[in-house]
Amino acid sequence: MLRSLFRRLFKYLLWFMAASVVLVAVLRWVPPPGTMVMVERKVGSWVDGQPIDLQRDWRSWEQLPDSLKVAVIAGEDQHFAEHHGFDLPAIQQALAHNERGGSIRGASTLSQQVAKNVFLWSGRSWLRKGLEAWFTLLIETLWTKQRILEVYLNSAEWGPGVFGAQAAARYHFGLDAERLSRTQASQLAAVLPSPLKWSAARPGPYVRQRAAWIRQQMWQLGGDDYLLRLER
C-alpha cells in the first residue's frame, strides 16, 4: 500500500512538472493574463468589503523605457545579466546581515520575484520556497533575460491595485511609461520594496535618497548600455 501511494505521488509530481514546463514555455511568447499577487489583492479587497479595480496595461519590451529597465536592475538585482536565477553572493551577504540582527534583508533576484509574483501565493513555507526555486529554474532556462525583465516590469506592484510600468506611470505621474524621465524611473524603482507604503510621486526623504542612489548605480552599471548584456 505504501509503495502504491509513493507511485501515485510520483505520478502526480511528473504531471505537475510537465504542466509547469508547458505553462512557462507558453508564457515566453504570451503575456501572462494576470499574477497570483493580483488575485490575492482582488480577493483580499472583497474580503475587506472594499473591492478595488486592478490597473494593468501590458507594454512590450520595445515600449518600455530603457531608463526604467536599468533603474529596476540597479535597485533590485545588479547581477541580473550574470546569474542564472540565484545570486549566491547576495544570499550569503543577506544571511550574514540577518544573523547580526536588525532589519531583515532579502536577496531575491528579479527571476525569483517573477517566479513568486506570477505563479505562487504569498507565504514563507518550505513548499513555497521549493516551488519558487523550480519556477525560477524554468524561466531562466526557457525565457531570455529580456523576457524575464519584460514580465517583471509588467507585473510588479506599484500601488494599491496598480500593476506594471504603464499603470504605474499613469497612477504616479499621469503620463505613459515611455515618457518617464530618468528621475521618475528611479523613483518608481525606489518604491518597489514597499509599493503600498511609499509613493513615487510624493517621495519622502528615504525614497528620495534611495532614488538618488539608484541613479548613481545606473551610471556605474553603464547606463542604457547595460541592456546590451541581456542579449547574450
Swiss-Prot record:
It is found in: Cell inner membrane. GO terms for cellular component: peptidoglycan-based cell wall; plasma membrane. The chain crosses the membrane at residues 12-31. It is a single-pass membrane protein. Its EC number is 2.4.99.28. One of its GO terms (biological process) is cell wall organization. It holds the Pfam family Transgly. It catalyses: [GlcNAc-(1->4)-Mur2Ac(oyl-L-Ala-gamma-D-Glu-L-Lys-D-Ala-D-Ala)](n)-di-trans,octa-cis-undecaprenyl diphosphate + beta-D-GlcNAc-(1->4)-Mur2Ac(oyl-L-Ala-gamma-D-Glu-L-Lys-D-Ala-D-Ala)-di-trans,octa-cis-undecaprenyl diphosphate = [GlcNAc-(1->4)-Mur2Ac(oyl-L-Ala-gamma-D-Glu-L-Lys-D-Ala-D-Ala)](n+1)-di-trans,octa-cis-undecaprenyl diphosphate + di-trans,octa-cis-undecaprenyl diphosphate + H(+). GO terms for molecular function: pentosyltransferase activity; peptidoglycan glycosyltransferase activity. Pathway: Cell wall biogenesis; peptidoglycan biosynthesis. Keywords: Cell inner membrane, Cell membrane, Cell shape, Cell wall biogenesis/degradation, Glycosyltransferase, Membrane, Peptidoglycan synthesis, Transferase, Transmembrane, Transmembrane helix. The keyword Aminoacyl-tRNA synthetase does not apply. Belongs to the glycosyltransferase 51 family. Peptidoglycan polymerase that catalyzes glycan chain elongation from lipid-linked precursors. This is Biosynthetic peptidoglycan transglycosylase.
